[in-house]
């Protein structure tokens, strides 16, 4: 059973990336997690501090080919662990030089994927850093009545910048014609270990998915629907 959203663009290769404006949307095929960044995320804008450079939607990262890709499968005690590693670099001559080293791992028999990222600035100059883990749950997990479970100290509606309660954002609605984006900004509460847990639960299917991450690295959750 698929847990993620897949868009109508299909899989799009890096060579077809459109960096300007909302061109990113022409290659956003969905998937369980899409990484956005690394020097910019968000709506397109002009960076007046960098010679009016045009910054396209969500940055370049998701279209940068990975290198040094490797797999490893081995026993670690009683666990059979599968790992996939690779590197991605966002760089320009006389400018940005950021390298992402990623490892995705799982243990045979577990229903869990772990993503470990390390970002290194290989330039002699400081660099901006913006990063989004764009999670894309889809049908049938995401359906009418699917619940978002989140412990938030504050939740606001993005466009109107007004505080909202769970009754407004917690339950998924049915598809609507000519619907606009609904975006909510959550400031989650971490547990004693400093980790945040967020879940999406379909009670009818008895199916769910959850995310766990350190709040010191990801202090804000954006809910887009």
Listing of model-derived features with the role each one plays in the protein:
Residues 1-108, 112-114, 126, 137-177, ...:
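Surface-exposed acidic/polar loop and edge beta-strand patches at domain peripheries
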Residues 125-132:
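Short, hydrophobic/aromatic beta-strand segments
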């Amino acid at each position: 059973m698929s847990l993620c959203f897949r868009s109508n663009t299909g899989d799009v290769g890096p060579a077809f990336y459109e960096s300007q404006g909302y061109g990113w949307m022409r290659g956003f095929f969905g998937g369980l997690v899409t990484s956005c960044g690394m020097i910019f995320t968000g709506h397109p804008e002009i960076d007046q501090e960098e010679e009016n450079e045009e910054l396209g939607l969500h940055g370049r990262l998701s279209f940068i080919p990975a290198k040094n890709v490797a797999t490893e499968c081995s026993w670690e005690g009683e666990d059979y662990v599968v790992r996939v590693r690779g590197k991605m670099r966002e760089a320009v001559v006389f400018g940005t030089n950021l390298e992402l080293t990623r490892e995705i791992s799982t243990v045979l028999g577990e229903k869990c994927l772990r993503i470990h990222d390390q970002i290194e600035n290989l330039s002699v100059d400081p660099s901006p850093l913006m990063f989004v883990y764009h999670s894309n749950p889809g049908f049938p997990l995401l359906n009418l009545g699917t619940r978002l479970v989140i412990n938030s100290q504050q939740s606001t509606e993005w466009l109107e910048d007004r505080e909202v309660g769970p009754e407004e954002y917690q339950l998924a609605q049915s598809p609507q014609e000519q619907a606009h984006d609904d975006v909510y900004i959550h400031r989650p509460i971490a547990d004693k270990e400093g980790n945040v847990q967020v879940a999406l639960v379909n009670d009818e299917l008895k199916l769910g998915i959850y995310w766990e991450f350190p709040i010191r690295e990801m202090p804000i959750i954006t809910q887009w629907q």
